């Protein structure tokens, strides 16, 4: 009996531990590694493409692979939507902070806006977060007056943006100075969420499209101007 032969009897003996497992064929291992490497290269090339951009690549890519990758991206999107629980910016009070922020961040990322209504920068950030919340409903966005959250919290440190995840504070942003000041955009804040781990680069790819960025700028300016006008009514 040749223990290296691929026979049903040898397979039975191997399953019982009587014969050692057959050594993998070197050529087969190399072939598998090559296939994996090619697929990884394809996926890396396509990673940040949205569904419309994938459609534009149909002439360049293998149809079967492209359809498989499109299905994968669609499933990722569905999985993300299935995790959606929020979609708005929710007001919280100091007694609720531990449960609504620290404890909640063990399951999802939580973004906290500490604000003061009279500050234009706080109005700007509030308008941006109101845009982002429905776009990323898997993230919990909350707001709390700064002086309610921390007694005598200085105006000079507001707005403050706190990003929690995995049960702990991941990033703290004091004022809009590091984001762009009064020119801070939706993309600037979204990129901060990426740096904190709350989003992936691919999640904000559509936001970075020049046309989308222009649209968002118009919506942001309109919202902020409305808030500022209210102050003089």
From Swiss-Prot:
Region annotation (Disordered) ranges: 207-233
Residue ranges of the region described as Thioredoxin fold: 86-233
Ribosomal protein listed as a keyword: no
SUPFAM superfamilies per the UniProt record, alphabetical: Thioredoxin-like (SSF52833)
GO CC annotations, alphabetized: cytoplasm
Superkingdom: Eukaryota
A Pfam family assignment: Phosducin
Keyword Phosphoprotein carried by entry: yes
Biased composition (Acidic residues): 224-233
Alphabetical keyword list: Phosphoprotein
Phosducin domain location: 58-212
Phosphoserine found at: 222-223
UniProt cross-references to InterPro entries, sorted A to Z: Phosducin-like_chap/apop_reg, Phosducin_thioredoxin-like_dom, Thioredoxin-like_sf
Entry's Gene Ontology BP terms: protein folding
PANTHER family per the UniProt record, alphabetical: VIRAL IAP-ASSOCIATED FACTOR HOMOLOG
Family: Belongs to the phosducin family.
Protein name per UniProt: Phosducin-like protein C2A9.09
Natural source organism: Schizosaccharomyces pombe (strain 972 / ATCC 24843) (Fission yeast)
Source lineage: Eukaryota, Fungi, Dikarya, Ascomycota, Taphrinomycotina
